[in-house]
């Protein structure tokens, strides 16, 4: 059985998806000062039963896990942000979380979601920094840019996923191209 945790989860969707995949709750949540208001709903979802570790206060994780996920703020590279730039301080959350997870937790896989521009020329300096962190800690770094429409969803949303794989082997992802549902059908299918 795989064990897992989240760092700077921000939103619940990815964390809840991890629980659905692994059929087990996270061992802990890792966070930094400034994210508490955003994460409160996720803590409430788990009835405050999951250890909530604030790294800014010097708290430490208690055990290693196989997988760690993150949804770091993406405003640094978002096309919706007027301040988007490769040197935006918002991008530092990807760097800071990668440094902690890869040096302290040392999972088999650390992965996250970010804006599509992470896989573009604008994101290249960030990718280079992440790749250096990976190499320094015995990981291989990869990115995967996709669109929600390719996964059968009616929402138009481009995203980039980034991965740190322990060692030098990277799995080959299957190309997915599912016909998207219609938003009207999705709305009609909601149980009331």
Model-derived features: where do they sit?
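SAM cofactor-binding core of SAM-dependent methyltransferases
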Residues: 2-58
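Structural cue for short, hydrophobic secondary-structure segments
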Residues: 6, 69-71
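Active-site glycine-rich loops that stabilize anionic/oxyanionic intermediates
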Residues: 10-11, 72-74
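Class I S-adenosyl-L-methionine
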Residues: 58-67, 74-192
């Amino acid at each position: 059985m795989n064990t897992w945790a989240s760092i700077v989860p921000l939103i619940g969707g990815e964390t809840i998806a991890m629980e659905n995949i692994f059929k087990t709750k996270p061992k802990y949540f890792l966070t930094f000062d400034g994210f508490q208001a955003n994460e409160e709903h996720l803590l409430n979802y788990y009835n405050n039963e999951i250890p909530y570790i604030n790294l800014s206060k010097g708290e430490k994780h208690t055990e290693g896990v196989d997988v760690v996920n993150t949804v770091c703020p993406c405003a640094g590279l978002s096309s919706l942000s007027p301040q988007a730039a490769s040197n935006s301080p918002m991008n530092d959350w990807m760097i800071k979380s990668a440094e902690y997870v890869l040096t302290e937790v040392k999972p088999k896989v650390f992965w996250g979601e970010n804006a599509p521009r992470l896989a573009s020329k604008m994101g290249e300096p960030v990718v280079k920094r992440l790749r250096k962190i990976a190499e320094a800690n015995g990981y291989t770094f990869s990115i995967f840019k996709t669109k929600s429409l390719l996964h059968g969803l009616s929402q138009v949303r481009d995203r980039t996923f980034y991965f740190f794989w322990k060692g030098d082997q990277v799995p080959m992802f299957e190309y997915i191209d599912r016909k998207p549902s219609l938003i009207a059908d999705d709305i009609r299918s909601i149980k009331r």
